[in-house]
Amino acid sequence: LLVRFEKLLESDAPLAEVLPSIYKQHEERYAGYTLRQLCQEMHDLYARHNVKQLQKEMFRKEHFPRVSMNPQEANYAYLRGEVELVRLPDAEGRIAAEGALPYPPGVLCVVPGEIWGGAVLRYFSALEEGINLLPGFAPELQGVYIEEHDGRKQVWCYVIKPRDAQSTLLKGEKL
Protein backbone atom coordinates (compact mmCIF):
# COMPACT_ATOMS: atom_id res chain seq x y z
CA LEU A 1 0.00 0.00 0.00
CA LEU A 2 2.84 2.39 0.87
CA VAL A 3 4.62 1.60 -2.41
CA ARG A 4 1.40 2.31 -4.30
CA PHE A 5 1.04 5.64 -2.50
CA GLU A 6 4.65 6.56 -3.35
CA LYS A 7 3.99 5.83 -7.03
CA LEU A 8 0.87 7.98 -6.97
CA LEU A 9 2.86 10.77 -5.33
CA GLU A 10 5.71 10.48 -7.85
CA SER A 11 3.27 10.57 -10.77
CA ASP A 12 1.47 13.55 -9.20
CA ALA A 13 -1.85 11.75 -9.55
CA PRO A 14 -5.06 13.78 -9.49
CA LEU A 15 -6.59 13.96 -6.02
CA ALA A 16 -9.97 12.99 -7.51
CA GLU A 17 -8.49 9.58 -8.38
CA VAL A 18 -6.47 9.03 -5.21
CA LEU A 19 -9.01 10.18 -2.60
CA PRO A 20 -12.33 10.26 -4.47
CA SER A 21 -14.63 10.47 -1.43
CA ILE A 22 -12.76 13.43 0.11
CA TYR A 23 -12.56 15.06 -3.31
CA LYS A 24 -16.33 14.72 -3.85
CA GLN A 25 -17.12 16.09 -0.37
CA HIS A 26 -14.89 19.13 -0.92
CA GLU A 27 -14.79 19.42 -4.70
CA GLU A 28 -14.81 23.22 -4.70
CA ARG A 29 -11.74 23.33 -2.43
CA TYR A 30 -9.73 20.62 -4.18
CA ALA A 31 -10.73 21.19 -7.83
CA GLY A 32 -7.74 20.43 -10.05
CA TYR A 33 -5.59 19.34 -7.10
CA THR A 34 -2.97 16.64 -7.28
CA LEU A 35 -1.73 14.43 -4.48
CA ARG A 36 1.61 16.22 -4.45
CA GLN A 37 -0.07 19.63 -4.04
CA LEU A 38 -2.11 18.34 -1.10
CA CYS A 39 0.92 16.77 0.57
CA GLN A 40 2.92 19.96 0.11
CA GLU A 41 0.17 22.07 1.70
CA MET A 42 0.01 19.68 4.66
CA HIS A 43 3.77 19.80 5.02
CA ASP A 44 3.83 23.60 4.80
CA LEU A 45 1.14 23.89 7.49
CA TYR A 46 3.02 21.64 9.91
CA ALA A 47 6.34 23.34 9.15
CA ARG A 48 4.84 26.84 9.61
CA HIS A 49 3.59 25.88 13.07
CA ASN A 50 6.64 23.75 13.88
CA VAL A 51 4.28 20.92 14.85
CA LYS A 52 7.12 18.44 15.27
CA GLN A 53 8.64 20.61 18.01
CA LEU A 54 5.25 21.29 19.61
CA GLN A 55 4.58 17.55 19.83
CA LYS A 56 7.91 17.05 21.57
CA GLU A 57 7.33 19.91 23.99
CA MET A 58 3.82 18.80 24.93
CA PHE A 59 5.18 15.59 26.40
CA ARG A 60 8.31 16.93 28.09
CA LYS A 61 8.04 17.81 31.76
CA GLU A 62 9.58 21.27 31.45
CA HIS A 63 6.78 22.25 29.04
CA PHE A 64 3.81 20.65 30.81
CA PRO A 65 0.89 22.99 31.50
CA ARG A 66 0.99 24.54 34.97
CA VAL A 67 -1.35 22.88 37.48
CA SER A 68 -3.67 25.38 39.11
CA MET A 69 -6.39 23.17 40.55
CA ASN A 70 -6.78 19.56 41.61
CA PRO A 71 -8.26 17.62 38.64
CA GLN A 72 -11.10 16.32 40.80
CA GLU A 73 -11.98 19.87 41.93
CA ALA A 74 -11.94 21.02 38.31
CA ASN A 75 -14.23 18.15 37.36
CA TYR A 76 -16.65 19.02 40.18
CA ALA A 77 -16.67 22.64 39.00
CA TYR A 78 -17.49 21.37 35.50
CA LEU A 79 -20.34 19.21 36.84
CA ARG A 80 -21.72 22.17 38.82
CA GLY A 81 -21.66 24.37 35.72
CA GLU A 82 -18.98 26.70 37.07
CA VAL A 83 -17.47 26.85 33.61
CA GLU A 84 -17.72 28.84 30.43
CA LEU A 85 -17.20 27.86 26.81
CA VAL A 86 -14.56 30.09 25.21
CA ARG A 87 -12.70 30.25 21.91
CA LEU A 88 -9.30 28.64 22.06
CA PRO A 89 -7.34 31.93 21.93
CA ASP A 90 -9.41 33.18 24.88
CA ALA A 91 -8.50 30.08 26.90
CA GLU A 92 -4.87 31.14 27.29
CA GLY A 93 -4.07 31.50 30.98
CA ARG A 94 -7.40 29.94 31.99
CA ILE A 95 -7.98 26.71 33.92
CA ALA A 96 -9.08 23.76 31.76
CA ALA A 97 -12.38 22.23 32.87
CA GLU A 98 -11.96 19.17 30.64
CA GLY A 99 -9.04 17.15 29.40
CA ALA A 100 -8.21 17.77 25.74
CA LEU A 101 -7.00 15.05 23.44
CA PRO A 102 -6.15 15.11 19.75
CA TYR A 103 -5.99 11.83 17.85
CA PRO A 104 -3.36 11.23 16.75
CA PRO A 105 -1.48 10.90 19.11
CA GLY A 106 -4.44 9.98 21.36
CA VAL A 107 -2.92 11.25 24.61
CA LEU A 108 -4.33 13.95 26.89
CA CYS A 109 -2.37 17.15 26.32
CA VAL A 110 -4.08 19.18 29.02
CA VAL A 111 -6.07 17.78 31.95
CA PRO A 112 -8.74 19.40 34.12
CA GLY A 113 -7.13 21.87 36.49
CA GLU A 114 -4.19 22.72 34.24
CA ILE A 115 -3.67 26.12 32.63
CA TRP A 116 -4.22 26.42 28.89
CA GLY A 117 -1.13 27.84 27.22
CA GLY A 118 2.28 27.12 25.79
CA ALA A 119 2.87 24.25 23.40
CA VAL A 120 -0.57 22.73 24.01
CA LEU A 121 -2.41 25.90 23.03
CA ARG A 122 -0.16 26.44 19.99
CA TYR A 123 -0.68 22.80 18.92
CA PHE A 124 -4.47 23.04 19.09
CA SER A 125 -4.28 26.38 17.24
CA ALA A 126 -2.31 24.66 14.46
CA LEU A 127 -4.96 21.93 14.32
CA GLU A 128 -7.67 24.59 14.02
CA GLU A 129 -5.87 26.16 11.07
CA GLY A 130 -5.50 22.73 9.47
CA ILE A 131 -9.20 21.97 9.89
CA ASN A 132 -9.99 25.13 7.94
CA LEU A 133 -7.20 24.91 5.37
CA LEU A 134 -7.56 21.20 4.61
CA PRO A 135 -11.21 20.12 4.89
CA GLY A 136 -11.62 16.37 5.05
CA PHE A 137 -8.43 15.83 7.04
CA ALA A 138 -9.48 16.97 10.50
CA PRO A 139 -8.04 14.99 13.40
CA GLU A 140 -10.39 13.57 16.00
CA LEU A 141 -10.51 15.95 18.94
CA GLN A 142 -11.95 15.24 22.37
CA GLY A 143 -12.46 17.75 25.16
CA VAL A 144 -12.67 20.65 22.73
CA TYR A 145 -15.49 21.56 20.39
CA ILE A 146 -15.56 22.68 16.78
CA GLU A 147 -18.14 25.34 15.96
CA GLU A 148 -18.59 27.23 12.73
CA HIS A 149 -18.75 31.02 12.90
CA ASP A 150 -18.68 33.32 9.88
CA GLY A 151 -17.75 30.43 7.58
CA ARG A 152 -14.76 29.40 9.67
CA LYS A 153 -14.46 26.45 12.03
CA GLN A 154 -13.23 27.44 15.46
CA VAL A 155 -12.01 25.40 18.41
CA TRP A 156 -13.78 26.10 21.71
CA CYS A 157 -13.15 24.67 25.16
CA TYR A 158 -14.60 24.79 28.65
CA VAL A 159 -12.64 26.69 31.27
CA ILE A 160 -13.35 27.28 34.94
CA LYS A 161 -15.15 30.56 35.62
CA PRO A 162 -13.22 32.97 37.80
CA ARG A 163 -14.31 32.57 41.43
CA ASP A 164 -16.00 35.98 41.53
CA ALA A 165 -18.15 35.03 38.51
CA GLN A 166 -19.43 31.74 39.94
CA SER A 167 -23.01 31.57 41.11
CA THR A 168 -23.57 32.23 44.81
CA LEU A 169 -26.51 29.84 44.63
CA LEU A 170 -24.04 26.96 44.67
CA LYS A 171 -22.64 27.74 48.14
CA GLY A 172 -22.91 24.74 50.39
CA GLU A 173 -23.80 22.43 47.49
CA LYS A 174 -22.12 19.05 47.71
CA LEU A 175 -21.62 16.39 45.10
Task: Identify the function of each model-found stretch.
Residues 1-175:
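Non-catalytic terminal extensions of PLP-dependent enzymes
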